[in-house]
Amino acid sequence: MNSLQKGSYKVIPGSSFSKNSNGLLSIKYNFIPESVDPSRRGVLEKAQEAYRLRLPSTFDDDRPHIFEGSCQRARNVDCVLIFNAKTKTFTLEHIDEIARLNALRNPKVSKTVPSNAITQSDNSQISESKSTSQSAVTTNSTRRKEKELEASKDGKIKPSSSNTRYPAISSKGPITTDTNDEPDMEVMELDDFAKELELGFDQEFNSIDDPSTVSQTASKPISLRGLSSQERDYASSAQAEGISSASEDED
C-alpha cells in the first residue's frame, strides 16, 4: 500500500457477495521469518477447526517454516479490501473464516515413522496381555480364598489373613529361657552334702552289730559349721533320724 496516494478511489463489490463465489480466508501471523522464500508456493492443511501452513524457506536443507493455529467463522461484517494498483480501484470481499497462526520453532517435519512409535495393533496386544495377567492373578487369589473359606466351614483350618508363618509353640510345659548354661552351684552343693550324709548313715547302719562302734558314732555329733541355714536344718533332721533308728535297734 505504499503506492497509495491521497485521493478518492472506487470500491467495487467482489464475487464473494454472490452465492457461487470462492471462499476467502484471513490469516494473522504472530511473525513471519525473513527466510521465507516468496518465489515458491506453500501448502495449507486443514483439520477440523485447525490450520497448518507450510511455507518454503531459503535454508540449505530446504527445511520449511511451519505455522499452526485455530480458526473461527467470520461475521457478516468481516470484510477485506483488495487494492489493484493498475486500475487504482478497491475490491470489497467478504471473509468466510479467520485463522490465527503461530510459527513453530524447530518443527518436526520428518516423514519417517519414529522408532518408538507403537501401532494400534501393538497397543491392543499390550492391553490384552495386561488384562489377561491381571485376570489370572485375580482368579488365583479368588480360588485360594474360596478354598480357605470352605475348609474353615468344615472345621479343618482357619482362613489366614496373611501369608506370614510363625513357629509353633508347644503347650506341654512352661516356656523357659536359658540365660546361662552354667549349672546352679548351690543345688550341686546341697546334692553333694546329702550324698555324704547318706554315706555316713550307711556306714553307721552297717556297723550297728558292734556296740562300741555305735556308741562312738552316736557320741560324735556332725559339725554344722560353715553350712547355710538350709543345710543345717537338713543335717540336724537327718542326724536325729539316724540316732533314733540306732537306739530302736539296740532295744
UniProtKB/Swiss-Prot annotation:
Biased composition (Basic and acidic residues): 143-157
Residues the record lists as Phosphoserine modifications: 247
GO CC term (a single one): transcription elongation factor complex
Stretches for region Disordered: 110-187, 201-251
Subcellular location: Nucleus
GO biological process terms, semicolon-separated: transcription elongation by RNA polymerase II
Superkingdom classification of source: Eukaryota
Gene Ontology molecular function terms on file: transcription elongation factor activity
Pfam families found in the cross-reference section: EAF
Bias type Polar residues, positions: 112-123, 204-220, 236-251
InterPro entries: EAF_fam, Tscrpt_elong_fac_Eaf_N
Keywords for the protein's UniProt record, in alphabetical order: Activator, Nucleus, Phosphoprotein, Transcription, Transcription regulation
Low complexity bias spans: 124-135
SUBUNIT field: Forms a stable heterodimer with ell1. Ell1-eaf1 complex interacts with RNA polymerase II.
Family the UniProt entry places it in: Belongs to the EAF family.
Function noted in UniProt: Activates transcription elongation by RNA polymerase II and pyrophosphorolysis as a complex with ell1. Acts as a transcriptional transactivator of ell1 elongation activities.
Name by which UniProt lists this protein: Ell1-associated factor 1
